[in-house]
């Protein structure tokens, strides 16, 4: 059976955790073997990077709804809970039911079938409360910022001490915001200039990467709907 976008993201997260690989290297290695359609590859990348960006926040929510302490879960089960909670809480376009159902299916397929009941129960609770998630304690403190923006507490405190709480929150929020998409040109099929022209024709802002050759930075627009995406003219990478 072909690998799905969520399965690719889960596999990449496990590779990242086990091998200490950079997230882009872990994902690239998985996507090379998965042979996903461009739209699914983009979804896998979004889930993988988004989960890693929000680990502390996701763990906060999961710990509320999971009766087993997170540190006692099998690591790959925790990986699956995290990426599924990310989809439910932070990705508006994915129906929560779809995220829950595929997580259970992946749990069974991925060699941790005994945890499928726990995965189902925890994610259903997250989905039921997605519009009223538990508050993060410590409002107005470094503890709050560390959880809300998934940054080390010491960094949040340093920003507060140096510039005040408002600046600290703005800085951490900006650092955790989605960066422009970095596209690696598939030079076997096109050139950077031709790709940029094609993206512009589809209403997607793009510009040459300041230091990477044969790469573009994209701001806004739906890359999955671009003609160049369907034609395999580029790969999304972390840069």
Question: Where are the regions a protein language model picked out?
Answer:
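Class I Rossmann-like S-adenosyl-L-methionine
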Residues: 1-228
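Conserved SAM-binding loop and adjacent beta-strand
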Residues: 230-239
């Amino acid at each position: 059976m072909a690998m799905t976008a969520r399965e690719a993201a889960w596999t990449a997260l496990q590779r990242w955790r086990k091998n200490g690989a950079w997230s882009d290297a872990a994902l690239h290695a998985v996507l090379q073997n998965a042979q996903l359609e461009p739209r699914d590859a983009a979804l896998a990348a979004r889930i993988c990077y988004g989960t890693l960006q929000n680990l502390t926040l996701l763990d906060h929510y999961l710990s509320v709804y999971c009766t087993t302490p997170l540190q006692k879960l099998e690591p790959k089960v925790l990986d699956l809970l995290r990426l599924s909670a990310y989809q439910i809480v932070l990705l508006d376009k994915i129906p929560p039911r779809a995220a829950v159902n595929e997580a259970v299916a992946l749990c069974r397929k991925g060699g941790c079938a005994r945890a499928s009941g726990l995965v189902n129960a925890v994610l259903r609770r997250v989905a039921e409360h997605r519009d009223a998630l538990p508050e993060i304690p410590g409002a107005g403190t470094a503890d709050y910022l560390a959880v809300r923006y998934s940054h080390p507490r010491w960094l949040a405190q340093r920003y507060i001490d140096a510039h005040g709480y408002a600046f600290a929150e703005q800085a951490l929020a900006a650092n955790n915001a989605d960066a422009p998409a970095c596209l690696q040109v598939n030079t076997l099929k096109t050139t950077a200039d031709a790709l940029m022209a094609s993206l512009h024709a589809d209403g997607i802002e793009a510009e040459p990467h300041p230091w990477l050759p044969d790469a573009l930075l994209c701001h806004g627009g739906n890359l999955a709907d671009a003609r160049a995406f369907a034609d395999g003219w580029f790969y999304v990478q972390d840069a």
